[in-house]
């Protein structure tokens, strides 16, 4: 029975430019058995093409169709939601701009003209950018969309601030929750990947990642099998703290090759999914 595997990248497949031991072998193992493997990252500072090149360089076979990042999800969402004449003001890096432009999203540098504000990870984030976004929201009732909810991103030197920092800044000044957060664990992202890319039923899909509040939460809410790996952000202690329970907990992705549920033709459940 064909299965779909949705792998996170940072903290799951690699850390920075260092492949996590057993990752390439695990992906090969699954691909050679006819399973559909895709990669889904919330990181918004690199393009999908960048990820194809990086994974290929690290010895993992993949192509553009099997790479999803939060920029791509955001662009697809906006393409469905925006009228052709509407404009977006973007706080983010070049990779986010590129993805939005590929989907035909019109971008303005003048926040006063914006119908939508897009927040992404921005390592040149300034008070002025925050002020412009706030003014567009206050004066134009612009909708606020964030690429992803992650507070931090794992790196070899430890976690660093991610898009969640920008969300916090905007919510701090506006006093409201922003309108939409894309990437994991959004319903839109899940539908896009499961129904339109993998084209499988949720129960045929496994999401593999190192974050409880994004990877595992997404799987639990939308009926996917969940595999938490302990090579990134989350720990056994985090599970107790958050109350988010993965279906499987593995030291790293290489242990997937020993799971009878994966290697056997018939999948047997080893625990209940938690809603």
Segments (PLM) and residue ranges:
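Asp-based, Mg2+/Mn2+-dependent phosphohydrolase catalytic module
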Residues: 1-7, 15-21, 25-33, 45, ...
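A metal-dependent hydrolase metal-coordination microenvironment
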Residues: 42
């Amino acid at each position: 029975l064909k299965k779909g595997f949705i792998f996170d990248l940072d903290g799951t497949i690699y850390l920075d430019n260092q492949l996590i031991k057993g990752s390439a072998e695990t992906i090969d193992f699954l691909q050679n058995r006819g399973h559909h493997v895709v990669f889904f990252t919330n990181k918004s500072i690199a393009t999908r093409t960048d990820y194809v090149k990086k994974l290929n360089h690290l010895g993992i076979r993949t192509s553009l169709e099997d790479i999803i990042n939060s920029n791509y999800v955001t662009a697809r969402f906006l393409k469905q939601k925006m009228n052709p004449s509407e404009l977006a003001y973007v706080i983010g890096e070049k990779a986010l701009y590129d993805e939005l432009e590929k989907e035909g999203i019109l971008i303005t540098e003048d926040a006063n003209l914006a119908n939508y504000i897009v927040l992404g990870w921005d390592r040149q984030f300034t008070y002025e950018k925050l002020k412009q976004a706030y003014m567009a929201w206050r004066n134009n009732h612009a909708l606020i969309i964030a690429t992803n909810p992650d507070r931090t991103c794992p790196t070899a030197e430890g976690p660093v601030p991610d898009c969640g920092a920008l969300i916090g800044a905007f919510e701090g000044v506006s006093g409201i929750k922003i309108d939409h957060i894309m990437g994991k664990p959004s319903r839109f992202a899940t539908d896009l990947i499961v129904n339109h890319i993998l084209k499988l039923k949720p129960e045929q899909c496994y999401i593999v990642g190192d974050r409880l509040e994004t990877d595992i939460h997404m799987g639990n809410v939308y009926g996917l099998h969940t595999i938490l790996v302990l090579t990134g952000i989350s720990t056994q202690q985090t599970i107790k703290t958050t109350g988010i329970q993965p279906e499987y907990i593995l030291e790293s992705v290489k242990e997937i090759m020993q799971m009878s549920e994966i290697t056997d033709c018939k999948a047997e459940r080893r625990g209940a999914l938690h809603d």
